[in-house]
């Protein structure tokens, strides 16, 4: 009997490990440094087999495009940082855990937060690959070949080395979507609904980067007269991409899977989402309390703002449990003076301030 129990427990642990692996665990490239291209032999499969969290399709792409992998890791890291910035004042603050799932069990729930995380990480990959192309780091791409904008003045030159957002978009689509596309779920199943949700949000993230890329120009001429301009395509600051996706998070559409294997609005009174919108299939879990099942870390010990009425305020952040006050010593630059020529000298001032943490 004990041996049978051990078998059952082992099976449950195995299936749970598989669930964690099935999460979007290519994100783990952000936490594990990927060797630079010059550090390994082109076509050497062991390098890709040693990278944690890749699906079979992603592993094949790794073998074909090994020099891209460090930039995929950079893109994932950029996405995680932006997620943590955007949610820094929310109950769920995009915390990472120390395993290949990166965000833990909370990503197994098809919530708004999961939708944002998929979108912003896909956006990070587009951003990193596009820039690597421009900087000459990848052998398969170079500067942007985007067509000259029709509204660009005739006497302005088009052809500076721009960010190759077209290539970045295409490669990110092929790599990031591989995990969802290589699976064959039963039509109308919850698993298929979740896969379609992930694909929609991946696309929304990529499109945010693609659509927000804009023309940048540099002046040429005697004494800065700007008699001539050279222009190129340039990525938007990633913070602006994050802001755009946060707006999409706030207006994300609740969806459900149909028997025909398509996502439809859970409430038909709302507008159909566009490819640039975020969607979700599950309600968000309770982020107030720590819950091992849902992966919620809770808000106990989180800093809160006593005077704010927003999500960062102690009343909302602490979910009505109350908060503790403690004294904190902060060191800041003060009494700064400009000295000729040319530097600024400051003193260091210490201040004891009250801070508050959730019970």
Curated annotation (Swiss-Prot):
The source's superkingdom equals Eukaryota
Please report any disulfide bonds recorded for this protein chain, giving both cysteine positions.
83-94, 133-141, 143-161, 217-231, 219-226, 288-319, 304-314, 318-358, 334-349, 336-346, 341-342
> What Gene3D superfamilies does the annotation carry?
3.30.2460.20
Q: Principal place where this protein is found?
A: secreted
Chain residues carrying a lipid of type O-palmitoleoyl serine: 223
Glycosites: 93, 99, 291, 305
Tell me the InterPro entries matching this sequence.
Wnt, Wnt_C, Wnt_CS
Q: Does the keyword section mention Signal?
A: yes
Post-translational modification, as annotated: Palmitoleoylation is required for efficient binding to frizzled receptors. Depalmitoleoylation leads to Wnt signaling pathway inhibition.
One GO MF term attached to the UniProt entry: signaling receptor binding
The residue range of the signal peptide is 1-17
Which Pfam families has this protein been placed in? wnt
Under PROSITE patterns, the record lists:
WNT1
List keywords of the entry alphabetically.
Developmental protein, Disulfide bond, Extracellular matrix, Glycoprotein, Lipoprotein, Secreted, Signal, Wnt signaling pathway
**A single GO BP:** positive regulation of convergent extension involved in gastrulation
Q: What is its subcellular localisation? A: Secreted, Extracellular space, Extracellular matrix
Quick one: a GO cellular component term?
Answer: extracellular region
The protein's role, per its UniProt record = Ligand for members of the frizzled family of seven transmembrane receptors. Probable developmental protein. May be a signaling molecule which affects the development of discrete regions of tissues. Is likely to signal over only few cell diameters.
For this chain, the family text in UniProt reads: Belongs to the Wnt family.
Subunit annotation: Interacts with PORCN.
Query: Which PANTHER family does the record cross-reference, listed alphabetically?
Result: PROTEIN WNT-5B (PTHR12027:SF87), WNT RELATED (PTHR12027)
Q: What is the protein's name according to its record?
A: Protein Wnt-5b
Task: Write down the species.
Answer: Mus musculus (Mouse)
Per the UniProt record, the lineage of the source organism begins with: Eukaryota, Metazoa, Chordata, Craniata, Vertebrata
Q: Which gene encodes it?
A: Wnt5b
């Amino acid at each position: 009997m004990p041996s049978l129990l051990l078998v059952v427990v082992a099976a449950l642990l195995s299936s749970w490990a598989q669930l964690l692996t099935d999460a979007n665990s290519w994100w783990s490239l952000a936490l594990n440094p990927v060797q630079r291209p010059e550090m390994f032999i082109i076509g050497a499969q062991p390098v890709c087999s040693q990278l944690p969290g890749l699906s079979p399709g992603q592993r094949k792409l790794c073998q074909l495009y090994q020099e891209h992998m460090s930039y995929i890791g950079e893109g994932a890291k950029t996405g995680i940082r932006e997620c943590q910035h955007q949610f820094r004042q929310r109950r769920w603050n995009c915390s990472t855990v120390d395993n290949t799932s990166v965000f833990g069990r909370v990503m197994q729930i098809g919530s708004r937060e999961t939708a944002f995380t998929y979108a912003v990480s896909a956006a990070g990959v587009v951003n990193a690959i596009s820039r690597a192309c421009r900087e000459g780091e990848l052998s398969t791409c170079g500067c942007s070949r985007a067509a000259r904008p029709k509204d660009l003045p005739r006497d302005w030159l088009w052809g500076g080395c721009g960010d190759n957002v077209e290539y970045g978009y295409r490669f990110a689509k092929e790599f990031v979507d591989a995990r969802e596309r290589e699976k064959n779920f039963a039509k109308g199943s919850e698993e298929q609904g979740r896969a379609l949700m992930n694909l929609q949000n991946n696309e929304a993230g990529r499109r945010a980067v693609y659509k927000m890329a804009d023309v940048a120009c540099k002046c040429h001429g005697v004494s800065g007269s700007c008699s001539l301009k050279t222009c190129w395509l340039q990525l938007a600051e990633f913070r602006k991409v994050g802001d755009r996706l946060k707006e999409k998070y706030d207006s994300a559409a609740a969806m459900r899977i149909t028997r025909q294997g398509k996502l439809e609005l859970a409430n038909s009174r709302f507008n159909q989402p566009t490819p640039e919108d975020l969607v979700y299939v599950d309600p968000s879990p309770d982020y107030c309390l720590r819950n091992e099942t849902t992966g919620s870390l809770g808000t106990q010990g989180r800093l809160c703002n006593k005077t704010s009425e927003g999500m960062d305020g102690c009343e909302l952040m602490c979910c009505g449990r109350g908060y503790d006050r403690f004294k904190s010593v902060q060191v800041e630059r003060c009494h700064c003076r400009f000295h000729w020529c040319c530097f600024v000298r400051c003193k260091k001032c210490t201040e004891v301030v009250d801070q508050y943490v959730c019970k």
